[in-house]
């Protein structure tokens, strides 16, 4: 049953894509204004108050910066200490990118590079 549903969704996606207007018709449309979008995207900058990757985010755990596609996550851990009392006192948090999101970004970048050139 699951396979049938997946095949039906895939068929509908392919059919709708093939029956849609061609890309040339879309680009000739007057409502398409890519010239207005490109300067906006180029002027977008990284927030100045965000915490960079591998920097301390112990005080503000929601301040991590975004990578190209995904927001980094504040991960906390307890560094190895000699005594048990020192371990309980010191929590260290850093902004990190989860590995699965890192692999997704790399894969999409390689697919984009392959498609463009």
Curated annotation (Swiss-Prot):
Disulfide bonds: 50-65, 57-74, 64-95, 76-93
Signal peptide (from-to): 1-20
Highest taxon listed in the record's lineage: Eukaryota
GO molecular function, one term: toxin activity
InterPro entries: Spider_toxin_CSTX_knottin, Spider_toxin_CSTX_Knottin_CS
Expression by tissue: Expressed by the venom gland.
One of the Pfam families matching this protein, by short name: Toxin_35
One GO CC term, this protein: other organism cell membrane
Propeptide span(s): 21-47, 82-87
Chief site of localization: secreted
Localization annotation: Secreted; Target cell membrane
Positions of modified residues (Threonine amide): 116
One of the protein's GO biological processes: killing of cells of another organism
Entry's free-text remark on domains: The presence of a 'disulfide through disulfide knot' structurally defines this protein as a knottin.
Function: Synergistic toxin that induces or increases a cytolytic effect when combined with CSTX-1 (AC P81694) or CSTX-9 (AC P58604). When alone, has a weak insecticidal activity, with an unknown molecular target.
SUBUNIT field: Heterodimer of A and B chains; disulfide-linked. Interacts with CSTX-1 (AC P81694), and with CSTX-9 (AC P58604).
Family as reported in the entry's similarity comment: Belongs to the neurotoxin 19 (CSTX) family. 12 subfamily.
Protein name per Swiss-Prot or TrEMBL: Toxin CSTX-8
Protein source organism: Cupiennius salei
Organism lineage string: Eukaryota, Metazoa, Ecdysozoa, Arthropoda, Chelicerata
